[in-house]
């Protein structure tokens, strides 16, 4: 029997506060939807917005596109919600995001990108990670996309977006999710070995031209002995 989503308390976030803003001004996010029968160019923008939301700006590459899903969406064979579901379950998304993160971080990333809000607290992160580890990534994605929260905010035809990132009452907006939660976490960076370690090694072995060994320097005899030693095994 699968474990249901555990209870977690809510916290105050911008999207849970009543809005007194004027619709259509600069503080409102641009909505990409298929409700108004979009043209071909408008459909291109909708597809691009979906990739940008799910894959983030750092991963919008031609290699990551799913032309089969795009074709289905263009010919109204699937809804925007199903297109979002397909991107989340695609092999490229799994390789780029799921395989390089732990369950907690991956759950946080998906909540931000699918529901358009930040996680409320660590309890919510744990609750979603339990769904992920006990029921698998497909059931986890289905739970997010089929949730009541997704239905009320985006429905079948609207691309998810970061809700109320900029509000009129504040001079600065919240950090975009693609910058707040990038692809790699600090723990994976340590396992991966980032380039600065290689740079440090290169800097330590670099010899400026003015202090290079001259004829008679013992360092040259060390290099010569190494060449003689390894020449026996060639």
From Swiss-Prot:
Main location: plastid
InterPro entries: PBS_linker_dom, PBS_linker_sf, Phycobilisome
Subcellular location: Plastid, Chloroplast thylakoid membrane
Coiled coil regions in record: none
Tree of life domain: Eukaryota
PBS-linker domain span: 11-191
Bilayer topology: Peripheral membrane protein
UniProt keyword Phosphoprotein, yes or no: no
Keywords: Antenna complex, Chloroplast, Membrane, Photosynthesis, Phycobilisome, Plastid, Thylakoid
GO cellular component annotations of the record: chloroplast thylakoid membrane; phycobilisome
Annotated GO biological process: photosynthesis
Pfam families: PBS_linker_poly
Family that this chain belongs to: Belongs to the phycobilisome linker protein family.
Subunit and interaction comment: The phycobilisome is a hemidiscoidal structure that is composed of two distinct substructures: a core complex and a number of rods radiating from the core.
PANTHER family tied to this protein: PHYCOBILISOME 32.1 KDA LINKER POLYPEPTIDE, PHYCOCYANIN-ASSOCIATED, ROD 2-RELATED (PTHR34011)
Functional summary from the UniProt entry: Rod-core linker protein required for attachment of phycocyanin to allophycocyanin in cores of phycobilisomes. Linker polypeptides determine the state of aggregation and the location of the disk-shaped phycobiliprotein units within the phycobilisome and modulate their spectroscopic properties in order to mediate a directed and optimal energy transfer.
Name used for this protein in its record: Phycobilisome rod-core linker polypeptide cpcG
Organism from which the protein derives: Cyanidium caldarium
């Amino acid at each position: 029997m699968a474990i249901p989503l555990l209870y977690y308390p809510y916290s105050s976030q911008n999207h849970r506060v009543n809005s007194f803003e004027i619709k259509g001004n600069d503080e409102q996010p641009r909505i990409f939807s298929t409700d108004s029968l979009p043209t071909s160019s408008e459909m291109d923008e909708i597809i691009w917005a979906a990739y940008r939301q799910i894959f983030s700006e750092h991963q919008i590459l031609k290699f990551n596109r799913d032309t089969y899903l795009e074709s289905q969406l263009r010919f109204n064979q699937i809804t925007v919600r199903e297109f979002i579901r397909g991107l989340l379950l695609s092999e490229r998304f799994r390789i780029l995001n799921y395989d390089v993160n732990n369950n907690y971080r991956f759950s946080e990333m998906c909540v931000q990108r699918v529901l358009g809000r930040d996680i409320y607290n660590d309890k919510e992160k744990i609750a979603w990670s339990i769904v992920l580890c006990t029921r698998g990534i497909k059931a986890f994605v289905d739970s997010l996309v089929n949730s009541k929260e997704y239905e009320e905010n985006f429905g079948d035809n609207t691309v998810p977006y970061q809700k109320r990132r900029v509000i009129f009452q504040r001079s600065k907006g919240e950090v975009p999710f693609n910058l707040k939660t990038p692809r790699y976490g600090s723990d994976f960076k340590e396992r991966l070995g980032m380039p600065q370690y290689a740079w440090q090694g290169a800097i330590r072995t670099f010899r400026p031209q003015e202090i290079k060994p001259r004829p008679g320097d013992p360092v040259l005899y060390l290099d010569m002995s190494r060449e003689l030693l390894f020449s026996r095994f060639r």
